Every structure is written in structure tokens, then in C-alpha cells.
Swiss-Prot record:
Family annotation (PROSITE patterns): EF_TS_1, EF_TS_2
Superkingdom in the source lineage: Bacteria
Pfam family, one: EF_TS
Cellular localisation: Cytoplasm
Stated family: Belongs to the EF-Ts family.
Organism lineage string: Bacteria, Pseudomonadati, Pseudomonadota, Gammaproteobacteria, Moraxellales
Main location: cytoplasm
Region of interest called Involved in Mg(2+) ion dislocation from EF-Tu, as start-end residue ranges on this chain: 80-83
Keywords: Cytoplasm, Elongation factor, Protein biosynthesis
GO CC annotations on file: cytoplasm
Biological function: Associates with the EF-Tu.GDP complex and induces the exchange of GDP to GTP. It remains bound to the aminoacyl-tRNA.EF-Tu.GTP complex up to the GTP hydrolysis stage on the ribosome.
Protein name: Elongation factor Ts
Disulfide bonding pattern of the chain: none
Gene for this chain: tsf
A single GO molecular function term of this UniProt record: translation elongation factor activity
């Protein structure tokens, strides 16, 4: 049997990023053949990734990469905030975002097939990262924003915004911050999706009818409720985050700025999360997983 030296373990660790003991075990099983050890580790990584795929990944980070008049927002999910802050996770997310922007690709399934600079596909890099970190990791969604001027704002790892606009740069930055804070649905009332307005109208009608008031009064109540809703979700009607005595529309007009569109991503939007376990339940789950 080939003797496993420290230099062999170091080389395998440098090439895979895995722990020393895991590298030594892989080399022992491969009788010192580094290439075979790497192949075996990849196979075990695929198995581990498949096993982890059932775990809910609702944490993670929003990554934004800009290239000229284009920028991409990418949400990459993991299971814990601890991993979201990990440098390996961050590097993976940035690499994926850069590759997706260069390819002009926003479909998650097609992003998985993209080739990276080291020759790996995004999916192969994801599997390797799952093996290294030990959590389910998923590239969930991506969106490209194009425009003459772009303003980018990130609130920590969890919220990212890109605004396409023309006009004053400081106002553009302020609007990006505002979108992060107030989460508007659309640039103006006219752009609010019809299905959202219809849903709000339906709710307002049900409430108004319960009042038992005449039909003409009910109609006014519904109109007022819908108008209030539009004031809350249309960007131009909201009170500006930097100066809450002014509406966004007034700020845009005063600075000669026009917002074409925006995209806001927040980590975990729409993902159903499991109820948090108690400490005792966490310990029991960990013991069960170790068996």
C-alpha cells in the first residue's frame, strides 16, 4: 500500500478545499492516487448534495454584479446565516452572478449548466461547496436590469436593489435605498399589476358590505380603500425615506430624475420555512442525523 504523505494530503486539500482528515481518508481509499481520490470525492459529493437537497434552504445572500449598463441580482440560498457569511459561499455566489451576467442568463436551470473559469459547471461547483460546507445550497433566481444609469443598494446580505433611472445620481441612490426600505410594487399606480388591485378591491368590497351601508356608500368605501392601497405600494406615491415630508414623485420632479424600473430581491421571499425547533429538539435531530 502506498504511504500517504503530508504533501499528498496538502495537495488534495489545496485542490478540493476539504478538511485534512477527509483528504487523508480519500487518499487512503484511493491507495495514494490523487486523481482517483478527487473522482471519488466528487461522487460522494454528488450523493451528499442529493441527500441535502431535501433540507429547506431559506437563508442565504443576494449578490449584485454590474457590467456597464447591465447589472444582475442573484439569490443563492443556504440553510443558516452562519454559512451565508462564509467566504466560500460568498465567492461562489459572486462567481455565479458574474457568469450569469456574462451569458445573459437568468433561468436557474440554465445557470446551473454554465461553465466557470476553472472548467467546472455551476452545478459541479455547487455540489463541491455542499460537500465542503455541509448544507443544502441552491441558486434560486436571477434578474438582469439594464438602463442608461443604474443605482445599486444592498442592505447587508439579505436585500438587494437595482434601479434603472435617468437624472441625478444622488437621487438615484436614494431611490434604491427607498425601494429596499419600503418595498414598492411598481414605479407608479398605473404599473401596479391588475390582479393585485382586483384582490384588494375584493377584500375592500367584502369589508364594506359587512357595514350594511347603502350601495353608493359602499362604492365610495371600496374606491377609498383601493386608493389607499395604491398610495402604499406605488413608488411615486410613497413618502420618501430620506425626507418623509415629501413624496417620491415630488423628489423626482425637483431633481429632474425619472425611474424606468427597479428590481428588489429579499432572501427567502416566498419560501415556506419550518417552525424553529427548541434546543432539545435540535439536539435530538442532530443525534438522529448522526446515526
Amino acid at each position: 500500500m502506498t504511504a500517504i504523505t503530508a504533501s499528498m494530503v496538502k495537495e488534495l486539500r489545496d485542490r478540493t478545499g476539504l478538511a485534512m482528515m477527509e483528504c487523508k481518508k480519500a487518499l487512503t481509499e484511493a491507495n495514494g492516487d490523487i486523481e482517483l481520490a478527487i473522482d471519488n470525492l466528487r461522487k460522494s459529493g454528488q450523493a451528499k448534495a442529493a441527500k441535502k437537497a431535501g433540507n429547506i434552504a431559506a437563508d442565504g445572500a443576494i449578490t449584485i454584479v454590474q457590467d456597464g449598463n447591465k447589472a444582475i441580482l442573484v439569490e443563492v440560498n443556504c440553510q443558516t446565516d452562519f454559512v451565508a457569511k462564509d467566504e466560500n459561499f460568498s465567492n461562489f455566489a459572486h462567481t455565479v452572478a458574474a457568469a450569469a451576467l456574462a451569458a445573459g442568463e437568468t433561468d436557474a436551470a440554465k445557470i446551473a449548466e454554465l461553465k466557470l473559469a476553472d472548467g467546472q459547471s455551476v452545478e459541479e461547483a455547487r455540489i463541491a461547496l455542499v460537500q465542503k460546507i455541509g448544507e443544502n445550497i441552491q441558486v434560486r433566481r436571477a434578474k438582469i436590469v439594464e438602463g442608461e444609469q443604474l443605482a445599486i443598494y444592498k442592505h447587508g446580505l439579505k436585500i438587494g436593489v437595482v434601479v434603472s433611472y435617468t437624472g441625478d445620481a444622488d437621487t438615484g441612490k436614494g431611490i434604491a435605498m427607498h425601494v429596499a426600505a419600503f418595498n414598492p410594487v411598481a414605479v407608479n399606480a398605473e404599473a401596479v399589476p391588475a390582479d393585485l388591485i382586483a384582490k384588494e378591491k375584493e377584500i375592500a368590497e367584502a369589508k364594506a358590505l359587512e357595514s350594511g351601508k347603502p350601495a353608493n356608500i359602499v362604492e365610495k368605501m371600496v374606491t377609498g380603500s383601493v386608493e389607499k392601497y395604491l398610495n402604499e405600494v406605488a413608488l411615486d406615491r410613497q413618502m420618501y425615506v430620506i425626507d418623509n415630508e415629501k413624496k417620491v414623485a415630488d423628489v423626482l420632479k425637483a431633481t429632474g430624475t425619472n425611474v424606468a424600473n427597479f428590481v428588489r430581491f429579499e432572501v427567502g421571499e416566498g419560501i415556506e420555512k419550518k417552525a424553529e425547533l427548541s434546543f432539545a429538539e435540535e439536539v435530538a435531530a442532530a443525534q438522529a442525523a448522526a446515526k
